[in-house]
Regions:
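Loop/turn elements at helix/coil->beta-strand transitions in domains of secreted/extracellular proteins
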Residues: 8-10, 57, 62, 96-98, ...
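Divalent metal-coordination and catalytic microenvironments
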Residues: 7, 25, 100
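Short, surface-exposed glycine/acidic/tryptophan-bearing loops
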Residues: 19-71, 90-92
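Short glycine-/small-residue-rich flexible loop motifs, especially phosphate/cofactor-binding loops
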Residues: 4, 49, 87
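Non-transmembrane alpha-helical segments in soluble domains
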Residues: 4, 26-33, 77-81
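Intrinsically disordered, low-complexity
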Residues: 1-20, 108, 119-123
């Protein structure tokens, strides 16, 4: 909801949740939590585009926001809105879908977040 509220304020169309993108985001959040590393590169993947393709989604473009800390989703989305780079991903006009994933690190306190934004290839 918060992501679409940000987009609406700027005259952009809302995004629809997508199960494939949520799977890609959740897998990446788990990978980051397992390694205790915040990175757009995962084990065995070159980046978000490759991870999204592995789910079967056929992207035209893909963007990703990541974060880690003792925060809930509302705080993470607020921080992404305050960051010009993260906000730019949320505001890409062409994106149509999103998926969010989270994983808790072994310390039981640090939450790793990944949000994937994408648009499918045109047929």
């Amino acid at each position: 909801r918060a992501t679409n509220a940000i987009r609406k304020q700027r005259g952009l169309k809302p995004l629809r949740a997508n199960a494939d993108l949520a799977l890609a985001a959740a897998r990446h959040a788990c990978d980051m939590a397992r390694r205790s590393v915040v990175s757009h590169r995962g084990v065995g993947t070159g980046g978000p585009m490759q991870r999204v393709k592995k789910t079967g989604y056929k992207p035209q473009l893909t963007a990703e926001n990541i974060a880690a800390g003792p925060w809930g989703q509302e705080r993470v989305l607020m921080e992404w809105e305050r960051s010009s780079g993260h906000l730019a991903n949320i505001l890409i006009p062409q994106i149509q879908h999103y998926g969010i994933g989270k994983a808790i690190a072994a310390d039981g306190k640090t939450v790793f977040w990944a949000a994937v934004y994408s648009a499918p290839k045109r047929r």
